[in-house]
């Protein structure tokens, strides 16, 4: 559905041992299937009536396992069910869901419009209890779903296909906790990454949904302040960058380093966010086809030498140090053979290279091309001894 997940993220493959663990746990949970949805803890069920919901084309109100429900079909994944006359800021959202396809249903909250919202969704496979990407939080920012540059915001869950599953979200300020079928929180988001503070609530499919409850203000003591960035005191991360305007890059072409912007006025600061992520999507939104930006920074070295650097990016990268190319690679989820660990997501596991430094200032320039979902970069030195990291002003 255009307003929720225009391109639902595909699914990962996992090692056989993890799959067996997931199947075993899922089978144990499924041994006593729920004939009716589990009772929610607070609030009143919102009936699926025209005065309460705007249902997109193809969404039907049904009775399923003895309760009123809606079915959002696979064919209508780009259509959503929107709750009317609700502006949600903080509180609890609960619902029961039965998946009809591993693609899974999604919940949008703080929905300003189709391009800016917070999103929680499920990839409801039988191995969900072992799969690191069974559930995920990711925001839409400027029309881009940032799922592939935020792999740390996904998790396994006790989700079971072909029966009711109870999902509960508690939203408080910049924090989010998610429970699936009770127990401990399956997902704890220390800092929400979207740009909306309040907005609507809606669902996309495919799936069957029932017992939707919204309890404004019920945050269960969850601190609204964001949790700490675990990398904040790590001096190895390159965080201060300047970014160029966006240019198009023809398919199959490589960027011309000599044609990067030369005038200082064409570059603007783009500091790294949490965990050292340089979020290009937040600045420029959805690329129009294969697009390129340049990022640059200065590394000042006390003496000439070489540092090892870990790098994460989506989708293509070229690294230049003092005008010489030292690294290039591809991390493209669309082509399984070109996916870097972890499964095509942006991570410092994507790659590493030798960073040659001369004594004094060294200009590091990185070209990053993208045409698919999130667009970003991370760079971290293995050892920051003898270097000073600053943004380039040249």
Predicted features, each with a name:
Residues 160-191, 316-326:
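Carbohydrate-binding surfaces in secreted/extracellular proteins
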Residues 306-320, 364:
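Aromatic-lined ligand-binding clefts that engage carbohydrates, nucleic acids, or primary amines
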Residues 61-79:
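Short carbohydrate-recognition loop motifs
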Residues 181-200, 326-339:
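Short, solvent-exposed beta-strand-to-loop segments that form ligand-recognition rims
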Residues 194-231, 347-356, 386-389, 393-394:
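Ligand-recognition surfaces built from glycine- and aromatic
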Residues 143-166:
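Short, aromatic/His-centered strand-loop micro-motif at the edge of beta-sheets
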Residues 216-302, 372-376, 380-394:
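Extracellular/secretory pathway-exposed regions associated with glycan biology
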Residues 77-142:
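Secretory/extracellular carbohydrate-interaction modules
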């Amino acid at each position: 559905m255009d307003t929720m997940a225009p391109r639902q993220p595909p699914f990962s493959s996992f090692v056989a041992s993890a799959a067996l663990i997931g199947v075993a746990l899922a089978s144990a949970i499924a041994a006593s299937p729920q004939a009716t949805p589990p009772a929610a803890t607070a609030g009143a069920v919102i009936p699926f009536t025209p005065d309460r919901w705007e249902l997109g084309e193809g969404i039907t109100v049904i009775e399923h396992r003895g309760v009123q429900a809606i079915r959002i079909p696979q064919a209508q994944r780009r259509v959503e069910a929107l709750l009317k006359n609700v502006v949600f800021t903080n509180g609890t959202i609960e619902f029961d869901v039965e998946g009809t396809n591993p693609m899974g249903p999604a919940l949008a909250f703080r929905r300003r419009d189709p391009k800016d919202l917070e999103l929680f969704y499920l990839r409801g496979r039988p191995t969900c209890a072992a799969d690191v990407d069974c559930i995920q939080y990711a925001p839409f920012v400027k029309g881009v779903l940032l799922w592939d540059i935020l792999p740390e915001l996904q998790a396994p869950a006790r989700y079971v296909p072909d029966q009711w599953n109870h999902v509960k979200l508690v939203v408080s300020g910049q924090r989010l906790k998610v429970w699936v079928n009770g127990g401990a929180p399956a997902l704890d988001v220390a800092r929400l990454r979207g740009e909306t503070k309040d907005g609507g609530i809606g669902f996309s499919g495919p799936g069957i949904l029932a017992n939707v409850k919204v309890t404004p203000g019920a945050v269960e003591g969850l601190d609204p302040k964001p949790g700490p960035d675990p990398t904040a005191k790590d001096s190895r991360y390159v965080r201060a960058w300047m970014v160029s305007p966006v240019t198009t890059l023809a398919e199959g072409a490589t960027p011309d380093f000599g044609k990067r912007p030369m005038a200082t006025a064409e570059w603007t600061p783009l500091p790294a966010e949490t965990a050292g992520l340089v979020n290009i999507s937040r600045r420029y939104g959805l690329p129009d086809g294969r697009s390129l930006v340049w990022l640059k920074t200065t590394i000042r070295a006390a003496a000439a030498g070489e540092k090892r650097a870990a790098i994460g990016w989506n989708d293509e990268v070229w690294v230049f140090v003092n005008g010489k190319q030292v690294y290039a690679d591809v991390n493209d989820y669309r082509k399984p053979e070109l996916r870097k660990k972890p499964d095509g997501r942006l991570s410092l596991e994507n790659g590493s290279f030798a960073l040659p430094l001369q004594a004094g200032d060294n200009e590091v320039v990185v070209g990053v091309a993208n045409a698919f979902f999130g667009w970003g970069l991370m760079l971290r030195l293995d050892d920051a001894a003898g270097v000073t990291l600053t943004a380039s002003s040249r």
